[in-house]
Structures are given as structure tokens and as C-alpha cells.
């Protein structure tokens, strides 16, 4: 069962014991309740919280909630194309900035390149736009959790690297989401430099 609306206690136990409560980014997922990507979002958030805790970062992600609010696929595609081509980003509708949370995960209904954007670029929140899972590459085993984690990495400020064995590999390198395919459930790792960057969050 998905753990929406309840923050895992483990996110807060260590900081409380050390006297420093973590900052939290509440996550709002925009998509239908039966979307298969919801489970992968939860797994990706758990992955990032493990990474953030391991480097003693003061940031955690969660809790996770879901909204039936939708964003037009045409706008999502325009944002994706603008990121890929270095063009000016079109803003999201103002109503989306009024949604609760600090990070929006938008589950698109069509196919384009998924993207992750730091807070303030298209909305008040950080935004991860995730392509449809109706077909490859997201329908391939182990891809969805890693692709979503990859885009959340961009929301956290990480950039692409060129190592195909690493989570954040991407353009202009030839890494593509299908490389995450595996019969074993696992997340691809971060580089030492990326872990150091997380420590400053």
C-alpha cells in the first residue's frame, strides 16, 4: 500500500535526537489514484531520503500526497522541449503554485522527455515531469523508479554526468532511461561529487 499523507518517522528521529529538526519538502503528486507510477514515486522519495540522511543533510522529502489537479500535456511537452533546447521556460498556471507542497511530481499522459526543475523555474515548487508509463522505457523493469529518482535529483540541483553506471547520467552523454532496465530491483548510485553536493542541502 502506498504511504501517502504519512511522513515516515525515520525521517525525523535522527535530527530530533541531535537537536536539529530537518527541513522537509512536502511532495504533491498530480495524477490519478490508479496510476502505476505512484509506487515508483514513493520508492524514489525513499531513495532520496536515504541518500540525504547518509550525508547528514538537513533536508528530507515528504510527506507525499496526491492531487487530481491536471496539467495539459501540451504544456508539459512545451516545458520538456524548452529544457532540452535551452529555450525560455513557459510558466505553469498560477493555480499550481497554490497547491500544497514544495515539490510537484506531474504524471503526464503522453510520451516526451521527462525533466526535473528546481523551485521557482516554472512554479513556486520544484517540479518533476514524468512521461507516460504506457510503453517503454518506463514499462521496462526497474526503469520507472530510477527515472523518477533521476528527475528528483535535478529538482535537488544535481546535473547530468557521463557515467552510464550512475543515476544522474544523461545528455549530452548517450545515457538514456532504458539503461536502468534490470531484472533486479535496485537504484543506480550517485557519484562522490553528487553526494558532497547533497550534504550542502
Predicted regions and their residues:
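Active-site recognition of the HExxH zinc-binding catalytic motif
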Residues: 146-160
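Metalloprotease/metallohydrolase-associated module, dominated by Zn2+-dependent proteases
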Residues: 119-120, 124-138, 142-143, 159-201
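Acidic/histidine-rich, surface-exposed loop or edge segments in extracytoplasmic proteins
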Residues: 21-35, 130-132
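Metzincin-family zinc-dependent endopeptidase catalytic domain
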Residues: 38, 42-149
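Bacterial Sec-dependent signal peptides at the C-terminal "C-region" and cleavage site
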Residues: 4-26
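Intrinsically disordered, low-complexity proline-rich regions
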Residues: 1, 11-13, 41, 184-188
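Active-site-proximal beta-strand/loop segments in catalytic clefts of secreted hydrolases
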Residues: 30-32, 106-111, 132-133, 158, ...
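Residues at or immediately flanking beta-strands
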Residues: 24-26, 56-60, 165-167, 198
Amino acid at each position: 500500500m502506498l504511504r501517502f499523507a504519512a511522513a515516515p518517522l525515520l525521517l525525523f528521529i535522527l535530527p530530533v535526537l541531535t537537536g536539529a529538526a530537518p527541513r522537509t519538502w512536502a511532495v504533491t503528486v498530480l495524477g490519478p489514484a490508479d496510476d502505476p507510477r505512484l509506487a515508483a514515486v514513493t520508492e524514489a522519495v525513499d531513495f532520496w531520503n536515504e541518500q540525504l540522511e547518509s550525508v547528514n543533510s538537513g533536508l528530507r522529502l515528504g510527506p507525499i500526497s496526491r492531487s487530481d489537479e491536471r496539467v495539459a500535456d501540451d504544456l508539459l511537452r512545451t516545458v520538456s522541449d524548452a529544457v532540452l533546447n535551452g529555450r525560455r521556460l513557459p510558466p505553469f498556471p498560477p493555480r499550481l503554485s497554490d497547491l500544497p507542497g514544495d515539490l510537484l511530481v506531474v504524471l503526464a499522459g503522453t510520451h516526451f522527455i521527462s525533466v526535473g526543475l528546481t523551485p521557482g523555474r516554472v512554479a513556486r515548487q520544484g517540479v518533476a515531469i514524468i512521461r507516460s508509463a504506457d510503453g517503454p522505457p518506463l514499462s521496462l523493469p526497474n526503469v520507472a523508479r530510477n527515472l523518477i529518482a533521476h528527475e528528483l535529483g535535478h529538482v535537488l540541483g544535481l546535473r547530468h554526468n557521463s557515467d552510464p553506471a550512475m543515476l544522474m547520467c544523461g545528455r549530452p552523454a548517450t545515457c538514456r532511461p532504458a539503461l536502468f532496465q534490470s531484472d533486479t530491483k535496485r537504484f543506480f548510485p550517485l557519484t562522490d561529487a553528487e553526494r558532497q553536493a547533497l550534504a550542502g542541502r
